[in-house]
């Protein structure tokens, strides 16, 4: 029987997201863009439990409308939020694997499928953690941990998180396996990221005028 997966997506208020793009998008456009990306990741699914971690009631309401479970926390920031909500997440699912994914992955239409394939192909007899990094090989867009490892993991999101998570796995004696999947490598944080998926952005924001790339 395949291992059961729970997909955990921390989601911040759409109105407060993507501030690094403030010179290219209006606040309303940034909010709509953040929501559109989150709706790709937080999609109704039967192949995994979907759990949204948030500290905003409007996000909680939105997540429930997407058939997701909701874990609320008073913590702010990605690492504190995951740490504070860890026990609630574990109580809300009996999944064998907990997969933490960012909410700003516009191409990630099948995170669960990509992770499940990697888990199924893992070498026997090894304790493994699975990571999908960004195109700069700096961040951790997707992090898949066994239930036991999720319970003890020290989340290190932020600059150089891939290196930090890889180092932690080494200290714990866990083998790191990278999920090399193009759909998981694109997140939208910078103007270069926007240019990579400008057709997606233009479809979401018909009132947006792209800057001249030159």
Where do the model's predicted regions map?
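Acidic donor-binding segment of Leloir-type glycosyltransferases
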Residues: 49-70
């Amino acid at each position: 029987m395949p291992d059961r997966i729970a997909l955990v997506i921390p989601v911040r208020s759409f109105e407060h997201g993507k501030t690094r793009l403030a010179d290219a998008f209006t606040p309303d456009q940034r909010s709509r863009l953040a929501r559109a990306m989150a709706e790709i990741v937080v999609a109704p699914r039967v192949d995994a439990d979907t759990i949204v971690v948030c500290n905003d009631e409007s996000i909680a309401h939105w997540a429930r409308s997407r058939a997701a479970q909701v874990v609320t926390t008073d913590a702010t920031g990605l690492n504190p939020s995951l740490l504070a909500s860890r026990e609630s997440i574990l109580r809300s699912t009996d999944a064998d694997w907990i997969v933490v994914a960012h909410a700003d992955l516009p191409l990630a239409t099948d995170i669960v499928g990509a992770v499940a394939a990697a888990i199924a192909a893992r070498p026997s007899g090894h304790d493994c953690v699975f990571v999908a990094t960004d195109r700069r090989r700096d961040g951790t867009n997707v992090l898949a941990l066994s239930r036991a490892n999720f319970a003890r993991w020290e989340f290190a999101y932020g600059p150089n998180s891939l290196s930090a998570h890889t180092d932690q796995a080494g200290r714990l004696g866990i083998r790191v396996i990278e999920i090399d999947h193009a759909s998981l490598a694109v997140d939208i944080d910078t103007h270069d990221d926007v240019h990579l998926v400008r057709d997606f952005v233009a479809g979401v924001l018909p009132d947006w005028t792209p800057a001249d790339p030159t």
